[in-house]
């Protein structure tokens, strides 16, 4: 019944190695309400943490969904006769590996955008985030609104 955390087994200075391996160093993301020791402790006890490392984010499913949704900006480019054309922008520093329905997986790089078209009759669409884990094989599926 512990909070999720990320770490390494490196025994020494790692500052000069960041970026060389192609991955960011592991980090524990703590969602504290304030910048105080008490607030950090409360967040840890409430298990409001995510582990980030080697291109993956792990944690409780709802927190993963909220984190991903907060990282995305959805813009309607134009509305056609049958489809709505959207831009989804990743406003975070994390590359996301996404899958929509039966389509191929795609990578959405940090601070980059991709285009989607959706039937005009829908107001939401689902993306499964393949580099987020809520269990060994569990990836959250997030509903985005436009």
Segments predicted by a language model, with ranges:
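Charged catalytic cores and adjacent phosphate/nucleic-acid-binding surfaces used
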Residues: 1-146
